[in-house]
Amino acid sequence: MDRRKKGSKHHLATDAAGTPLAAEVTAANVNDVTRLIPLVDAIPPVRGKPGAPRHKPGEVMGDRAYHDEQRRTVLRGRGIAPVLARRGDPHGSGFGILRHVVEQTIALLHQLRRLRNRFDKRDDIHQTFLTIGCAVICWRRLHRLTG
């Protein structure tokens, strides 16, 4: 952990279409791997097919920053398949093709000035604006589908 690193990071969980399901703000010097399980826990139940809503994703994809054998074991114990790039493996694994969905959603969030440049000193205020930004993205997608 680099204790001198300033700023904050946005951790984001999306569905396959890039719709934000959960978002979290942490300090820039926090390791990404420590936020994997809380981010998965923050995903709300999602309705889809008839019946009870899904309370957990079928699989979790992530880049090398989220790879850890202990976290993989926890996810498998919950019935979630971890599809995480391993540290030390050569590049070209094909994750970039899938990762662009999350990167595009992050880019949409950073189009909002309050999220691109952090002016808020308090984390809870910045987290609120991140949640509002996710709601704006969801509304725009819904409006585009129904409009």
PLM region descriptions:
Residues 1-87, 133, 140:
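Polybasic low-complexity intrinsically disordered regions
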Residues 69-73, 77-79, 92-147:
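Basic, amphipathic alpha-helical segments enriched in Lys/Arg and hydrophobic/aromatic residues
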